[in-house]
């Protein structure tokens, strides 16, 4: 989590929190791999909300407090939701909930229902026919996954009347179905929530149909008149009449009775056949809902009551360490196996030495284990102390290098760049889907090649074929799988600077920094090398919006580092591209001499970079920030500070409809 330092400047803390919350949103919604609990996440959000309210001059519509997390994926077509799909504000105790009920109306009726831990989905019906199934996405725009969702047999494809409405539900998997499916596939999936969320994003509906997905629906948005539907109870009756599957135990009761009923739900939680992480409480009256309205992030008429993470006792048997690709050392406890949230837990994270000291943890200690967000096992509390508190060794367990702390970090690092475990994790990172995407080279395969000495560093991947005869003799490496690996390695050479630079794992140089460098003319390794030799390198980089002092220092250090220079030179000789591919140019060049920036969301350009691609293809220049040199700003709903700055500077403002008219006038077709 983003750790607060004493007397930290509010502006710096706000920036830190926004970045940290954005990272955790991506891990949860896009990667299905959260690393903190929901409660820890909400603590960060509440701190940011407080700071933003105390410092209104630092408000920003792009702040995560003004948006919902996004699960948008580039491979799916996009759909603009007819009503914003908001998230719920969370509460973790009865006192907070009681205060909200008093404010909203303690005597009013509320619905109380399970909060299922799955994947949110919206079912769009036009004239009674199911036309689109769409993920929540960013809240304004979602991914169209219609054919995948239609494989769930309990979803009605036709309603009894020609109604136009949107049904919201949650796609999930029961614990029993998950265990059976996961066993069949070698235990490769972490939990039901991840598998359900990943399943609806599969490319082939036939693959989705093999997965035991289920759905419960819980709300309806009406396109026009509600036709006598005045309460949530009426909505549930309509859904039941149309034969939609509804979650068990949903009840309507007054605010006073609701507080008493929560305890009975809490007792049932661990016996539920599907994953739940809390309760949803909503005002029953739709008219009252409309009068209360919503914020940009959540409705004022609903709350999520989140259960604290499930805890179980176990004993620490051993403590070992993971060494990441950056050298960060993470201790983890091997514990007596326990069953927790439907899975067997044998390891739990201990984070760092400071955390171990705070807990008083060590070998032999009895501890409480939680599954963070019911996903990440962690040691939460010591219930019976060990003989001695565990102390990290002074030396790296992989290479015996002395461990050190970097700057003010609470973590220890192995600084040996040739540490075997660091090298192994660098290789895994390089081959991963988000980096060079070398199919067939997962963690297991890379570890085998690494242990055999075939692949010790990134360049060795591109000479691996010399071991092909021996490789084919290994169990699990047939002709077909080996061909996939070598084809993928060769195909990775087609990736340009946008991928090669961030994939080699240079500290502070990720995809975003790489894109900013390219946009500002540093579109190759050679140009960066030339820059590094300039006396004005520091000043030139400082002039680029989006690149801070820490990144500048790291980048210039990398560009003078002998090992980094040797690595890139070797990879270039092996055929990898360290220059950005030129954007395809058209004979039509109406945007020559123009610099365009983009902000907001768009109906016809999803993602919005598609609009910028058209501009660069037809002679224009794309910029990431508004300045006096910017000639045009293309803006849509949700435009923030860029629109204000462009207005102040007199930059020409262009709406989506105006942009479409301009393209039409110039004879430019949208691909």
Curated annotation (Swiss-Prot):
Reactions that this protein is recorded to catalyse: NAD(+) + (deoxyribonucleotide)n-3'-hydroxyl + 5'-phospho-(deoxyribonucleotide)m = (deoxyribonucleotide)n+m + AMP + beta-nicotinamide D-nucleotide
CDD domains with a match to the protein in the record: BRCT_DNA_ligase_like, LIGANc
Binding positions (Zn(2+)): 396, 399, 414, 419
UniProt cofactor(s): Mg(2+); Mn(2+)
Keywords linked to the UniProt accession: DNA damage, DNA repair, DNA replication, Ligase, Magnesium, Manganese, Metal-binding, NAD, Zinc
InterPro entries assigned to the protein according to its UniProt record, in alphabetical order: BRCT_dom, BRCT_dom_sf, DNA_ligase, DNAligase_adenylation, DNAligase_N, Hlx-hairpin-Hlx_DNA-bd_motif, NA-bd_OB-fold, NAD_DNA_ligase_OB
SUPFAM superfamilies: BRCT domain (SSF52113), DNA ligase/mRNA capping enzyme, catalytic domain (SSF56091), Nucleic acid-binding proteins (SSF50249), RuvA domain 2-like (SSF47781)
Residues of the BRCT domain: 586-671
One of the record's GO molecular function terms: metal ion binding
Cleavable signal peptide: none
Pfam families recorded: BRCT, DNA_ligase_aden, DNA_ligase_OB, DNA_ligase_ZBD, HHH_5, Nlig-Ia
BP terms from Gene Ontology: DNA repair; DNA replication
Active site feature: 115 (n6-amp-lysine intermediate)
Keyword set includes Magnesium: yes
Gene3D superfamilies: 5' to 3' exonuclease, C-terminal subdomain, 6.20.10.30, BRCT domain, DNA ligase/mRNA capping enzyme, Helix hairpin bin, Nucleic acid-binding proteins
Residue positions binding NAD(+): 38-42, 87-88, 113, 136, 170, 282, 306
Enzyme Commission code: 6.5.1.2
SMART domains: BRCT, HhH1, LIGANc
Similarity-based family: Belongs to the NAD-dependent DNA ligase family. LigA subfamily.
HAMAP family listed in its UniProt record: DNA_ligase_A
Record's function text: DNA ligase that catalyzes the formation of phosphodiester linkages between 5'-phosphoryl and 3'-hydroxyl groups in double-stranded DNA using NAD as a coenzyme and as the energy source for the reaction. It is essential for DNA replication and repair of damaged DNA.
Protein name: DNA ligase
